[in-house]
């Protein structure tokens, strides 16, 4: 038994995707596995300690070097680490990269009426001389989950796969149970954590977090925190290039807005993107306030929201930041 941070993250919308088109659901899994493979390669070939001193902090934040266990099952993943601070930063970066992997499709949709619509171009398996062009959809890869800290026990239970016996790896303990319970407490692609995790964080990690603004059924604060994971893409070391850094805001906001517009008539889905958009805006404000350019980002945000939303929509979605 040891003390670890444990994250439980789940793909939003995966169940509906499996029901409607299993092949597109498999594509969602393939995308985040591709990102994981890339991070695994980087940690082996270019560990953050090998970078020059000014870049080591950035390299560490964008790696997965703190991931000790990464255990996927269907659309869910358990991840564990002994280093809470690095873990939260790197988990946030992983979630950010998962969405950005195909976000360009939604930012510049082939069919504005459906930003997930695209096509697959490849070689015809039955005739290698022919190119095939198949219409398809690419659902966004967005995670929601929880992180807890506490006792974790690593076990190796017996299992079967394709009638073959094998020994699998498993995690159990209080931290695992608490992480799973947090996953569905709020709407949107958000990663929550409790005060036990917060107590373990250094100042850098705390900067990328906030108290969850939602209240419980009695109107009381939930008493939980969340990772401002859209903030992970900004290079805070580039203060002099703050105008260029605004591109990251639009890299996230534009595809999220187009997806919200597409699902706007479906309230159950739309609210997921409304919470996502608010998280993107809050994260940008946090970064630019830190860099000393708060007035700049507030102007850009106000300008963007005014051009995209009605006054009622702005008040409903962004009441916590405007």
PLM regions and their residue ranges:
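Catalytic/regulatory signature loops of cyclic-dinucleotide turnover enzymes
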Residues: 148-150, 174-195
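Intrinsically disordered, glycine/charged-rich C-terminal tails and inter-domain linkers
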Residues: 188-322
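Short, His- and charge-rich active-site/binding loops that engage polyanionic ligands
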Residues: 98, 102
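Catalytic core of nucleotidyl cyclases, primarily class III adenylyl/guanylyl cyclases
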Residues: 6, 44-87, 105-171
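Short, solvent-exposed loop/turn segments at secondary-structure junctions
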Residues: 14, 152, 197-200
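Active-site-proximal alpha-helical element of nucleotidyl cyclase-like catalytic domains
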Residues: 23-63, 90, 94-97
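Catalytic-site or vestigial catalytic-site microsegments of nucleotide-handling domains
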Residues: 6-16
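Core nucleotidyl-transferase/polymerase catalytic module
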Residues: 3
């Amino acid at each position: 038994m040891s003390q670890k941070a444990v994250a439980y993250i789940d793909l939003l919308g995966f169940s509906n995707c499996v029901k409607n088109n299993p092949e597109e659901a498999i594509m969602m899994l393939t995308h985040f596995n591709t990102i994981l493979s890339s991070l695994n390669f980087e940690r082996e070939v270019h560990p953050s300690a090998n970078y020059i001193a000014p870049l080591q902090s950035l390299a560490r934040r964008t790696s997965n070097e703190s991931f000790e266990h990464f255990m996927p099952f269907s659309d869910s993943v358990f991840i564990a680490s002994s280093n809470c601070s690095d873990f939260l930063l790197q988990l946030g970066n992983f979630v950010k990269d998962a969405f950005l992997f195909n976000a360009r499709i939604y930012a510049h949709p082939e069919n504005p009426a459906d930003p997930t619509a695209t096509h697959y171009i490849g070689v015809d398996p039955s005739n290698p001389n022919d190119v095939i062009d198949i219409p398809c959809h690419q659902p966004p890869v967005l995670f929601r989950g929880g992180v807890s800290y506490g006792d974790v026990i690593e076990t190796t239970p017996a299992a079967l796969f394709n009638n073959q016996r094998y020994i699998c790896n498993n995690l159990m303990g209080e931290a695992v149970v608490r992480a799973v319970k947090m996953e569905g407490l709020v709407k949107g692609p958000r990663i929550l954590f409790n005060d036990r995790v917060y107590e373990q964080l250094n100042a850098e990690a705390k900067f990328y977090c906030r108290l969850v603004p939602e209240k419980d059924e009695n109107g009381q604060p939930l008493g939980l925190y969340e990772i401002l994971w859209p903030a992970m893409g900004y290079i805070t070391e580039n203060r002099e290039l703050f105008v260029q850094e605004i591109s990251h805001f639009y890299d996230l906001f534009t595809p999220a807005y187009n997806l919200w517009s597409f699902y706007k008539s479906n309230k159950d889905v739309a609210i997921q993107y409304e919470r996502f958009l608010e998280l993107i805006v809050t994260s940008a404000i946090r970064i630019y306030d830190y860099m000393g350019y708060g007035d700049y980002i507030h102007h850009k945000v106000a300008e963007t929201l005014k051009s995209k939303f009605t006054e009622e929509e702005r008040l409903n979605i962004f009441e916590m930041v405007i």
